[in-house]
Amino acid sequence: MDYNNLLKNKTALVTAGANGIGYAIAKKFEESGAKVFVCDINQDAVDMVNKNHQNIKAIFCDLSQTQMISSMVESTFDYLGHLNIIVNNAGIAGETAGVGEQTLGGWQECLQVNLTSHFETMRVAVPRMEDGGAILSVASVAGRVGFAYRLPYAATKWGVIGMAKSLAVELGPRAIRVNALLPGIVQGERQDKVIEAKAKVRGISFEEMKDEILSAASLGRFVTHEDLAEQAYFLCSDLGKNISGQAISVCGNIEKAN
């Protein structure tokens, strides 16, 4: 078995796929033989993908606008012809504050992007998917252990896991595997903003907050985008052909809420 080319002749849709985790996954899939369609809210990132990749097509799409999703899925099938893999990667960090300082608007925005966009993408695309495919929804370890001051975010990630487990049962007869990927403390600009916001709430320094957050993981280090792309490849290829309905953490073993 050629472990580096297991997605040859496969097609994939990756939402929020022009930067960060989604882009790392899209690149890994392309390197492994897949033809990939991505959407993203960052037009500069979309332009970069289209300039630098032969087998990844990117378009602008604001997944907080539900009415744009049907059009995005139609564009996916126009480009790919058929669809084997869906990666629901869209997500925002949401507000970082105590429950009394959270806003209803912030809650609703987090729900829309992190949960409703996943549902709507699958509602429209899954009936047209090829049997024997795979769906991977990016959740978070916050959907397993809970994160203080991140109530909307954590709630949506629990929801993503619940959707994946339920859909795995429903789509089993079609041999479509459905799993959730749970990143831990992911290195990057978004994580830095979260650490900064939590440090402000706690009244401590950025470095103190970062050290405290990393101490929650047994391995004591950040997760990289590439770590997550490798796991996504495993779960969406034949390497994970008997794995479905699972919530797979890539977090360095976060043992406690933080």
Sequence positions of predicted segments:
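Active-site loop-to-helix junction immediately N-terminal to the catalytic Tyr of the SDR YXXXK motif
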Residues: Q102, G146-A154, S166, V194
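C-terminal helical subdomain
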Residues: A180, I204-I243, V250-G252
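Residue(s) in the substrate-gating loop at a strand-loop-helix junction
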Residues: S140
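Active-site helix of classical SDR
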Residues: M122, T156, A164
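Substrate-binding pocket helix/loop in short-chain dehydrogenase/reductase
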Residues: A97-V99, T103-L111, I213
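Short C-terminal tail/terminal secondary-structure segment
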Residues: D2-N4, A93-T96, V145, R221, ...
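Short, small/polar-rich loop/turn modules that mediate ligand/substrate recognition or access, typified
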Residues: G172, R177, I243-G245
